[in-house]
From Swiss-Prot:
It is found in: Cell membrane. Pfam families: CD36. Plays an olfactory role that is not restricted to pheromone sensitivity. It comes from Helicoverpa armigera (Cotton bollworm). Disulfide bonds join C268-C333, C297-C352, C335-C341. This is Sensory neuron membrane protein 1.
């Protein structure tokens, strides 16, 4: 039996609508997820792997230094008055070197290398890096704080050593060019032959102090970031490639061959999260994105804040802070003991960096108000000083990231050292950094063409197919049954009587009605 033409058209249109439903809402999402799982894994064939190994554009690395405008008064115990100088802008190029794949457990090992170039044009107006800044002497304070914590009986000898190494300093402050303390380095004189300076310098060589580089003639050069510049980091990091399971991509599983740290307590020693340069796809808003910082030896777990967009791509914004170790059970294990945590918003970096420093949010944002009251000149603002990531949830791509951390030090107060006996003992800021990532137009367009344009086309096409297919099916069915529908419509409004031929012959006009008498008209 051959179908009527109208039903054929209806069947074809219905098939189009059904295909739109199946392809648009079932097949395409499945194909997309399958393809993304392949593309987002760190296999040698993917673009993600190439970009993960060497970011093809520079990150923004900004440094803000706190200049102590009343150093002489602070030496006598006064409240520091600070003036922020910056940003000093550096172009930061990141790459991973000595990369090795391990097929047996789906991991990669690598080391990091960062290269910094000073960019005066992007720095604050007038800053050249040659400005003299006045800050607490990081190296001198570091020596005193470390000995006071670990070997307090040795403080007297350290005092003599500092007088020899630093030529009888008048106070605990450093007056130095900005670029010297940041990258170029300042000379630490270890050529003295007296016992105390010589013994101290020998210990420095043996322990390998962070930021210290041995120079000829028994000299050291000290800077904050100089040892990182164009230097291969000695730590070997192991992460998951995500080929077996894309949700594990970038997950840190070991550092220097060890699957756990030994510097904290309990679960804080675990490696949780990715290495911060790649994240898994398909992460819902209800879940946190986790990354492990090898610089700070801890995991950060930003939480969802709001919907955002970047260059036409919808993103989710996640934010984070240092945390409150005393009152957050998940973070308490970062304290040496449960009841000896630093104030809210501070993290003791000594176990990680081997230097007596504290990390916080810039300007003590989200920190104990008491910290802010100990200094003048700080103005915390979440827009300028917060940590945030604009994250594309389908691919797991960080579109915009702003990592902001402030480094602080304690003005040690002790009667065993003349230079330290009148200090306040408070924790004060030294500088803060703003490391920023923003995908440029080239990579945003690449992401759009590979993912979002096809996704939008399919999104429009599926609705077109369902809408017009359904409409075509309805029209075809209506046309096929139009005569029957019309008869039904007529029968509902008109009564029809069946008349036989015999009845027709017997009918006359009277059946219809009797004749009426003409109306009379009076003339």
């Amino acid at each position: 039996m051959q179908l009527p033409r109208e039903l054929k058209y209806a069947a074809i249109a219905g098939g189009v609508a059904l295909f739109g439903l199946i392809f648009g809402w079932v097949l395409f999402p499945t194909i997309l997820k399958s393809q993304l799982k392949k593309e987002m894994a760190l296999s040698k064939k993917t673009d993600v792997r190439k970009m993960w190994e060497k970011i093809p554009f520079a990150l923004d690395f900004k440094v803000y230094i706190f200049n102590f405008t009343n150093a002489e008064e602070v030496q006598k115990g006064a409240t520091p008055i600070l003036k922020e100088i910056g940003p000093y802008h550096f172009d930061e190029w990141k790459e991973k070197v000595e990369v090795e794949d391990h097929e047996e457990d789906d991991t990669i090992t690598y080391k990091k290398r960062d290269v910094f170039y000073f960019n005066p044009e992007m720095s604050a107006p007038g800053l050249t890096g040659e400005e003299i800044v006045v800050i607490p002497h990081i190296f001198m304070l570091g020596m005193a704080l470390t000995v006071a914590r670990d070997k307090p009986a040795m403080l007297n000898m350290v005092g003599k050593a500092m007088n020899g190494i630093f030529d009888d300093p008048p106070d605990i402050f450093l007056r130095v060019k900005a670029l010297d303390i940041l990258f170029r380095g300042m000379i630490i004189n270890c050529a003295r032959t007296e016992f105390a300076p010589k013994a101290t310098c020998t210990a420095l060589k043996k322990e390998g102090v962070s930021g210290l580089v041995l120079e000829p003639n028994n000299q050291f050069r000290f800077s904050i970031f100089g040892t990182r510049n164009n230097t291969i980091d000695p730590h070997v990091i192991t992460v998951k490639r995500g080929i077996t399971s894309v949700m594990d991509v970038g997950q840190v599983v070991a550092v220097d061959g060890k699957t756990e740290q030994t510097i904290w307590r309990d679960t804080c020693n675990e490696f949780q999260g990715t290495d911060g340069t790649v994240f898994p796809p398909f992460v819902p808003e209800t879940e946190r994105i986790e990354s492990f910082s090898t610089d700070l030896c801890r995991t950060f777990k930003p939480w969802y804040q709001k919907k955002t967009s970047y260059r036409g791509i919808k993103t989710n914004r996640y934010i984070a802070n240092i945390g409150d170790f005393a009152n957050d059970p998940e973070l308490n294990c970062y304290c040496a003991k449960p009841d000896t945590c630093p104030p809210k918003g501070l993290m003791d970096l000594a176990p990680c960096m081997k230097a007596p420093m504290y990390a916080s949010m810039p300007h003590f944002l989200d920190s104990d108000p008491a910290l802010l009251s100990k200094v003048k000149g700080l103005n915390p603002d979440v827009t300028q000083h917060g940590i945030e990531i604009d994250y594309e949830p389908i691919t797991g791509t960080p579109m915009v990231a702003k990592q902001r951390i402030q480094f602080n030090i304690q003005l040690l107060k002790t009667d065993k050292l003349d230079l330290f006996k009148d200090l306040s003992g408070d924790i004060v800021p030294l500088f803060w950094i703003d490391e920023g990532l923003a995908l440029n137009k080239t990579f945003v367009n690449m992401l759009k063409h590979q993912l979002f344009i096809p996704k939008r086309v399919v999104g429009v096409l599926r609705w077109w197919m369902v809408s017009f297919g359904s409409l075509g099916a309805v029209i075809g069915i209506v046309f096929h049954f139009r005569d029957h529908i019309m008869r039904l419509a007529v029968s509902g409004d008109t009564k029809v009587s069946k008349v036989t031929p015999e009845e027709e012959e017997q009918k006359d006009i009277s059946v219809i009605g009797q004749a009426q008498e003409p109306a009379k008209v009076n003339i």
